[in-house]
Regions:
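Phosphate/pyrophosphate-binding catalytic cores of soluble transferases and nucleic-acid-acting enzymes
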Residues: 2-320
Length: 320
């Protein structure tokens, strides 16, 4: 791997986004082969230890060659917030820059990018401790479903992105809309555009959906059933994710130390995961398309993306 030519330069963070199965990680790895880099995951599921197959973590052999951060941070029974991600990611970005390395932030979790691209507004937007306490009390009295329905009536776009059991983010979204009278997106539209290098990958819908379907098939071939059912407690935040929550009510047995699900039910679960993944890809595209500072590339134009990023890095470091 070639070292960066000028170690005194502070290399700018590179942001790589896009829908699931679009090849984001592969682009990050290829970029890291050109620059001495640290890859920082912006994926809300890859932070969980042992959840490897359903979260499509990069192969361990690659992670041993190229430093990967914010993967395997907490156990599946632990919760992890956007604020925690932002704090850890900021530290990893600074550590990489102080070591003369290129920080590459890659993933598909929109709120994680939001926290890094708009740190001040994300952290400080209309915090209201009294309102938050009131909302927390409502949560205790009426439950997660009722709070999610409340958000659905006030800010349906944000509600559609959040699972009802993701109560921290539901409460935060309610706090913002009730404090400002504006939806999360309306608040975001008023912010100043960040001066960052960010690319995103996409392709024709049919091609993307086929890639998603093949990825899901591969996950099952690699042992997704065993991974999910070995955790088993679907009350965990980690188990609310696509690829895991679909197993919540399945019937299974244990044979020779392995979890076994009937073929017909397994096919239904697999189809649900594919459908949910395709729907998630639509939501990801909607999220990242609202960033008008993003440069989009087709998934087959990885070289073009790397050339663009390299040019932007040269422009930014030339000003130092």
């Amino acid at each position: 791997m070639r070292k960066n030519s000028n170690m005194s330069k502070i290399l700018p963070p590179i942001y790589i986004a896009g829908p699931t199965a679009s090849g984001k990680s592969a682009l990050a790895v290829k970029l890291a082969s050109k620059f001495d880099s640290v890859i920082i995951s912006a994926d809300s599921m890859q932070i969980y230890r042992t959840l490897d197959i359903g979260t499509a973590k990069e192969d361990i052999s690659i992670r041993e060659k190229i430093p990967h951060k914010l993967i395997d941070v907490v156990d599946p029974n632990e919760e992890f917030s956007v604020a925690e991600f932002a704090r850890l990611a900021k530290t990893e970005i600074e550590n990489a820059q102080n070591s003369g390395k290129l920080p590459i932030i890659v993933g598909g979790t929109g709120l994680y990018f939001e926290a890094l691209l708009y740190p001040m507004s994300f952290a400080n937007t209309n915090k209201n401790d009294v309102l938050r306490e009131s909302l927390q009390q409502e949560l205790q009295n009426f439950g997660a479903h009722a709070m999610h329905q409340k958000l659905q009536s006030l800010d349906p776009q944000t509600a559609n992105r959040l699972h009802e059991n993701d109560t921290k983010r539901v409460i935060r979204a309610l706090e913002i809309v009730l404090s400002t009278g504006k939806t999360l997106e309306q608040n975001q539209d008023e912010r100043q555009k960040p001066d960052v290098i960010m690319v995103a990958l996409n392709t024709d819908r049919d091609v993307l959906y086929e890639r998603i379907n093949k990825r899901v098939d591969k996950m099952f071939d690699e042992g997704l059933v065993q991974e999910v059912l070995s955790v088993g407690d679907f009350s965990y935040q980690s188990m609310q994710a696509i690829g895991y929550k679909e197993f919540a009510n399945c019937n299974f047995s244990v044979e020779n130390g392995k979890y076994v699900v009937g073929d017909a039910e397994l096919d239904q679960i697999k189809d649900k995961i594919k459908q949910h993944s395709r729907n998630y890809a639509k939501r990801q595209l909607t999220w990242f398309r609202k960033y008008d500072f993003v440069k989009w590339f087709d998934i087959n134009d990885v070289d073009g993306a790397i050339e663009y990023i390299s040019q932007k890095i040269a422009e930014k470091t030339a000003l130092q």
